[in-house]
Amino acid sequence: FILWFGWYGFNGAACTTIEDLGSVFLTTTVSPAIATVTCMVFTWIKYGKPDVSMCLNASLAGLVAITASCDVTDAAGAIVIGIVAGLLVVFGVWLLDYKLHIDDPVGAVAVHMMNGIWGTIAVGLFATSKAPGYAIAIESGAIKAEGLFYGGGFTQLGLQLLGFVSVAAWAAVCMTIVFFVIKATIGLRATEEEEIKGLDICEHGLTSAYAGFELGTAGMPDITYEDVVSVGSESMENSVPAMIKTSDIPDENKITKVEILMKQ
């Protein structure tokens, strides 16, 4: 929500009239709101309850998607842009996580890349002369015509697609070179050991970089890695370090309480 609040300044900073500013604030509100509701309804139907984390990503996706066209589209265009953004982030995360098996724990590709592409294309579909910022955009040469769905034909849509392909090609070439250099020098991925321990402690020497998420040790017994419980056919070296504490409950209850403390 801090991002959402800041997005009004991000999108509205260049406005020169109150009418243009009001229109930008409207579209910047409508698109993420619709994206959030769309994602909530979809995940509610699919999983039986709303996915809060996914819905918050949908809010950000709606903001990303509306940015390119925020000053040249109207509320109707913002609604459609938001609906697509809300669905796109869900299917994008599913595609990356479950089909392509790409490590993207925060859904950045689905939120920013996919919806950035969608938002860029949306200008060629929903740009309208009814928006206060349209005349300024035409005068400055930022756009050439109305969007396809507002009677402008394929002119602006073609320009938006050309812009997308150009940026994608430039980024792909440059970042491929950069990533190969990183891989050949300091390494591109964290080791398996670093992933298990956490990069906060390996890279920065911190138990956790987030307040409230530190490992709690007060009142807990020391757990040493010599105390190992072997489970199944795994070797002792690969077993989970643990301490098992057993305390009896009065005999009349006929049960035994077992507490297992594990340090991961």
Where in this protein do the model-derived segments appear?
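Glycine- and aromatic-enriched membrane alpha-helices
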Residues: 1-264
